């Protein structure tokens, strides 16, 4: 499904509080731009807050200044000018404060969500969800201006929230519904019936909250999202040059101004609320400031006075999204676990993870970006993220475990965790990288002082159980009433003699029976509190290790998808590997799968995936993906594949590939050769159809006696493409086809006879001699181009080889072979009265007639079903590929369904469709062919379809299943004798063909179909489309002249013609005629 049009952001800014994280988060924004989550032209900026406690308002003002500076510079100005805001859509995202459950903050907390329609596979963070909401849901339709969005909440917004921007000015807040009880700990808006904001309450009284209740019984919560019009943004930007608000920006800080802390909602926006008076506003304090000294209050009052002067006359309105939802990400582990799990779910959520024993994951648990090897048991309501674990491990209910690797698994063996939060952290202490671990209880409070808990028990009980003392954790002067979890020096970060692991904290869960050894080791370690640990976290290493683990599990997934033959697309994963700069490990994995595959289908798909990786690495440059694949440099690996040595072939391909990686043009050519290698394996799979080719020896016709084979054309009514290898044996194919005469004639034929000369005389073309191409093969060298489809007579040469008359690699000369077995040579003519690229199956049916005539001339009879498989074999020898529907349609009489199962060897079975009496004549009266005048170019269409199938693009896989399913429905339409039902089948069949091969409907054909639409039940181009014949089921009988008149009135249709068509009930016919002189001799 196509993504709706979103906001084309001019600038996206991500604010963060740590200077050393700016570059890290800048890269994260750039990665998202490469993934196409952010428009290519958007300016991306990660901006450090000028001071750690600058507040959401100060961070907004600083970010707005930085955006204006960059846009001013880009526009060629030498000073900041607010004019640049007039045509800009700016998005400011605030990272906010530290989060106890993710080292990279609430923005980069991973959610148990997968986006199956994303072009690039990736973990979904809260930031990604908010970007999507802002770009595609809240942002569209807004005028130029500045959107500001916190990242400390989980939001859900419907696809069309119904926000009107008519006559908008000022600022607009987005509110989402919540219960009055939830609002007691949050912000809530009071508005008038028109949506004008009257006041904003934070942790309001019951009476205040009741005033905000809407008719639905809910209250509009402060959601953390606000929009400033250009005018309001200019007013806000103007404050950055005046004290004390200049201290909110990096310019003020660089000038030595004293920092000031401002709230976006309770300072900047609050002054715009209608009911707020100047006096109340000036003495108020934002909730994030807390209680402080009078000096701070006076400084803040001055800042608020300035905001009042600039912004008071700007209207503040609210957009209430009644069907959305809002959840603030608190420091409660219980609430966090609840937000990441589905308590009533029937099973576990497994996202971007590979789990060997899924049955050990309890319902209502969640696993994100993990590799779990062996027995890893996970209890209900528990969450595993970014872990590579090796069992046996038992994680009970109510746990959060993140950031552990295989080296840490041993510490968890033989122990059950319950109601705990265990995290591994990347650190950088005095410039040296390291690992630290934190362990807390699910029920522990990060805010409570004094009567708090640790590991879910009161501090006193913890001290008693472990031997830890208060002075181990806090300074001696700290009073018991001041004990709190964030300041407790609990967590070892460095041990004097060994590496640290989870065991350095897990000992605290039990009464000690080791004589105090663990306690002594803990005391001997350098320990930090959670607050002290935050500035030491290495966020670059954290994100790098998450990315590494994501790709490690992705390689396991790729291997499993290929080896288990799953219909999952690896294209998004391929794009991820290429765009994040690590295609090498993926290529190595694909090589391993291809080399070790016992199934040519699995190996061919793996090679097609390699071709996809190379194509993606070219990034749209270097030419078209479809093209020649016969460069001499690649012949050595191809030769290994041809002789069945898959492992050597794959290795040789990889060695050659390494020489073609330096620039896009070479990458594209290498991709073509990998597709060529895949074709070799497809060919070997299809060759298995030879199992079902058998001949019966009969009397040899006399020298000079002609054997004539004639065939109708075929029209496909449903299921085409499903017969094409590899779909035919990977998905299983089903095609309904009709054998048809065109203008009363059977247009395809061949004749063969023995001649005394030990040579092969070949003639190709219509029966009229002046158009015939004549070829004489006197030696084996004359046959060597049998596998080059465009070489003159290639199909006829391949027919001699496939019929076993000539052995092209024999040491015997051609004349010796012919004299020894047949006492002379052969003459073979083939003809078709249909134009090239007709779409009526000409070449495959021609191959069938040529084989039938040749075999009979050589004293053998081939059954029609055997002949169907023989043509499959011949077309692989000829290297044109192709499916089985054409020969089934033309060689077998009447109306029938051909089917092949999802297995090798490839076998085609044919079922005749019985229709009501008189229906064939009725069909003849309503069926017409229109030659469009356009030649179909099926070769590139075929390559594109195979590429899409091997990539298992979801739309193509779904469509392929629909093709097979509809064939059975179409057969039912014939059994009922219902023309309207068959017309519906044709119409939907044409839509399916277009989905399978985009580009198969030329504009002139579309115009012709539009003109004919009112007169027909249904219509479709024959075969793969792109040109050739259009067939129609007319509403009225015998409409040839009427439709000729309709088309004659339409300009620009080109050289078209309308033809009568009737169902042929004979199929392939074979006759022996008398002897006569050759019509094409003397040969040159």
UniProtKB/Swiss-Prot annotation:
Q: InterPro entries of this UniProt entry?
A: GDP_fucose_pyrophosphorylase, GHMP_Kinase-Related, GHMP_kinase_C_dom, GHMP_kinase_C_sf, GHMP_kinase_N_dom, Ribosomal_Su5_D2-typ_SF
Tissue specificity note? Expressed in fibroblasts.
Coiled-coil intervals: none
- Its EC top class is transferase
- Keywords on record: ATP-binding, Congenital disorder of glycosylation, Disease variant, Kinase, Nucleotide-binding, Transferase
Give the record's GO CC terms. Answer: cytosol
Query: What is the residue range of the signal peptide feature?
Result: none
Entry binding sites for ATP? 834-845
Its GO biological process annotations read:
carbohydrate phosphorylation; GDP-L-fucose biosynthetic process; GDP-L-fucose salvage
Superkingdom per UniProt: Eukaryota
**What disease is linked with this protein in Swiss-Prot or TrEMBL?**
Congenital disorder of glycosylation with defective fucosylation 2: A form of congenital disorder of glycosylation, a genetically heterogeneous group of multisystem disorders caused by a defect in glycoprotein biosynthesis and characterized by under-glycosylated serum glycoproteins. Congenital disorders of glycosylation result in a wide variety of clinical features, such as defects in the nervous system development, psychomotor retardation, dysmorphic features, hypotonia, coagulation disorders, and immunodeficiency.
Q: PANTHER family from the xrefs?
A: L-FUCOSE KINASE (PTHR32463:SF0)
* Protein family according to the UniProt entry: Belongs to the GHMP kinase family.
**Free-text function comment from the UniProt entry:** Takes part in the salvage pathway for reutilization of fucose from the degradation of oligosaccharides.
Q: What is this protein called?
A: L-fucose kinase
Source organism of the structure: Homo sapiens (Human)
């Amino acid at each position: 499904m196509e993504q709706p049009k979103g906001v084309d952001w001019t600038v996206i800014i991500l604010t963060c509080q740590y200077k050393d994280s700016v570059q890290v988060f800048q890269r994260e924004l750039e990665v998202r731009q490469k993934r196409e989550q952010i428009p290519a032209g958007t300016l991306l900026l990660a901006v450090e807050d000028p001071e750690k406690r600058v507040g959401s308002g100060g961070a907004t003002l600083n970010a707005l200044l930085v955006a204006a500076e960059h846009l001013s510079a880009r526009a060629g100005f030498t000073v900041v000018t607010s004019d640049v805001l007039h045509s800009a859509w700016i998005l400011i995202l605030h990272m906010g404060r530290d989060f106890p459950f993710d080292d990279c903050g609430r923005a980069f907390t991973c959610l148990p969500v997968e986006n199956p329609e994303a072009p690039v596979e990736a973990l979904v963070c809260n930031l990604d969800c908010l970007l999507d909401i802002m770009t595609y849901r809240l942002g569209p339709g807004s005028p130029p201006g500045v959107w500001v969005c916190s990242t400390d909440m989980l939001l859900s917004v419907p696809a069309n929230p119904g926000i009107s921007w008519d006559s908008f000015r000022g600022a607009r807040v987005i509110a989402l519904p919540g219960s009055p009880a939830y609002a007691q700990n949050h912000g809530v808006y009071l508005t008038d019936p028109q949506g004008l904001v009257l006041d904003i309450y934070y942790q309001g009284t019951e009476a205040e909250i009741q005033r905000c209740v809407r008719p639905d019984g809910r209250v509009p919560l402060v959601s953390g999202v606000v929009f400033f019009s250009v005018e309001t943004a200019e007013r806000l930007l103007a404050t950055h040059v005046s004290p004390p608000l200049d201290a909110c920006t990096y310019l003020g800080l660089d000038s030595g101004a004293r920092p000031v802390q401002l709230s976006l909602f309770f300072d900047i926006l609050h002054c715009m609320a209608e009911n707020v008076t100047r006096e109340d506003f000036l003495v108020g304090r934002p909730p994030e400031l807390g209680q402080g000294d009078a000096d701070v209050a006076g400084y803040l009052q001055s800042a608020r006075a300035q905001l009042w002067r600039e912004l008071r006359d700007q209207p503040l309105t609210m957009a209430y999204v009644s069907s959305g939802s809002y959840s603030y990400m608190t420091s409660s582990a219980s609430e966090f676990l609840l937000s990441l799990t589905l308590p009533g779910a029937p099973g576990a959520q497994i996202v971007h993870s590979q789990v060997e024993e899924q049955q050990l994951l309890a319902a209502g648990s969640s696993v994100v970006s993990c590799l779990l090897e062996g027995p890893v048991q996970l209890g209900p309501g528990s969450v595993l993220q970014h872990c590579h674990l090796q069992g046996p491990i038992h994680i009970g209910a109510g746990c959060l475990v993140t950031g552990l690797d295989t080296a840490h698994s041993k510490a968890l063996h033989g122990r059950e965790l319950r109601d705990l939060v265990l995290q591994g952290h990347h650190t950088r202490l005095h410039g040296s990288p390291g690992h630290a671990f934190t362990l807390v209880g699910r029920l522990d409070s990060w805010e409570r002082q004094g009567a708090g808990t640790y590991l879910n028990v009161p501090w006193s009980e913890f001290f008693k159980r472990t031997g830890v003392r208060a002075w181990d954790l806090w300074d001696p002067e700290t009073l018991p009433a001041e004990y709190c979890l964030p300041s407790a020096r609990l967590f070892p970060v460095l041990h004097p003699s060994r590496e640290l692991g989870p065991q350095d904290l897990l000992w605290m869960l039990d009464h000690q029976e080791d004589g105090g050894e663990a306690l002594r080791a803990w005391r001997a370690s350098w320990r930090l509190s959670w607050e002290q640990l935050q500035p030491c976290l290495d966020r670059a290493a954290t994100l790098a290790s998450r990315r590494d683990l994501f790709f490690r599990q992705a390689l396991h997934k790729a291997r499993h998808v290929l080896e288990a033959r799953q219909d999952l697309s690896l294209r998004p994963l391929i794009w991820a590997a290429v765009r994040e700069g690590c295609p090498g490990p993926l290529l190595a994995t694909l090589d391993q799968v291809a080399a070790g595959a016992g199934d040519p289908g699995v190996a061919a798909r793996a090679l097609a995936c390699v071709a996809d990786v190379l194509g993606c690495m070219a990034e749209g440059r270097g030419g078209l993906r479809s093209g020649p694949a016969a460069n001499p440099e690649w012949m050595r690996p191809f030769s290994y594949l041809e002789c069945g040595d898959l492992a050597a072939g794959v290795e040789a391909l990889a060695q050659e590939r390494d020489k073609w990686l330096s620039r896009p043009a070479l990458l594209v050519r290498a991709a073509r050769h990998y597709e060529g290698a895949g074709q070799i394996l497809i060919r070997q799979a299809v060759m298995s159809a030879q199992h079902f080719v058998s001949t019966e020896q009969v009397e040899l016709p006399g020298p000079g006696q002609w054997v004539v084979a004639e065939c109708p054309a075929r029209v496909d009514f449903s299921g085409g493409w499903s017969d094409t290898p590899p779909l035919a044996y990977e998905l299983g194919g089903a095609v309904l086809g009709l054998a048809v005469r065109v203008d009363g004639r059977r247009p395809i034929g061949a004749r063969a006879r023995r001649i005394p000369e030990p040579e092969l005389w070949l003639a190709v073309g219509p029966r009229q001699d002046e158009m015939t191409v004549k070829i004489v093969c006197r030696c084996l060298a004359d046959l060597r181009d049998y596998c080059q489809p465009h070489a003159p007579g290639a199909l006829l040469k391949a027919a001699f080889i496939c019929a076993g008359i000539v052995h092209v690699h024999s040491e015997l000369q051609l004349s010796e072979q012919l004299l020894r077995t047949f006492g002379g040579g052969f003459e073979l003519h083939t003809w078709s009265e249909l134009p090239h690229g007709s779409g009526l199956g000409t070449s495959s049916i021609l191959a069938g007639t040529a084989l039938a005539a040749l075999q009979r001339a050589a004293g053998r009879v081939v059954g029609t079903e055997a002949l169907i498989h023989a043509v499959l074999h011949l077309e692989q020898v000829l290297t044109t590929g192709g499916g089985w529907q054409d020969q089934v349609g033309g060689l077998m009489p009447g109306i029938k369904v051909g089917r092949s199962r999802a297995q090798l060897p490839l076998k085609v079975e044919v079922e005749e469709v019985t229709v009501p009496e008189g229906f064939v004549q009725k069909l003849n009266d309503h069926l017409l062919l229109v030659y469009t005048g356009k030649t179909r170019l099926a070769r590139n269409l075929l390559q594109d379809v195979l590429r899409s199938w091997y990539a298992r693009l979801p739309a193509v896989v779904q469509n392929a299943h629909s093709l097979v399913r509809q064939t059975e429905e179409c057969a039912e339409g014939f059994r009922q004798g219902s023309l309207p039902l068959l017309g519906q089948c044709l119409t939907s069949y044409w839509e399916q063909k277009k989905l399978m091969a985009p580009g198969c409907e030329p504009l002139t054909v579309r115009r012709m179909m539009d003109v004919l639409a009112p007169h027909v039940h249904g219509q479709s181009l024959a075969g793969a489309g792109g040109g050739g014949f259009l067939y129609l089921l007319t509403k009225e009988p015998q409409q040839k002249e009427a439709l000729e008149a309709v088309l004659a009135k339409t300009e620009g249709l080109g050289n078209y013609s309308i033809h009568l068509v009737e169902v042929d009930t004979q199929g392939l016919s074979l006759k022996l005629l008398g002897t006569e002189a050759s019509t094409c001799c003397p040969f040159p």
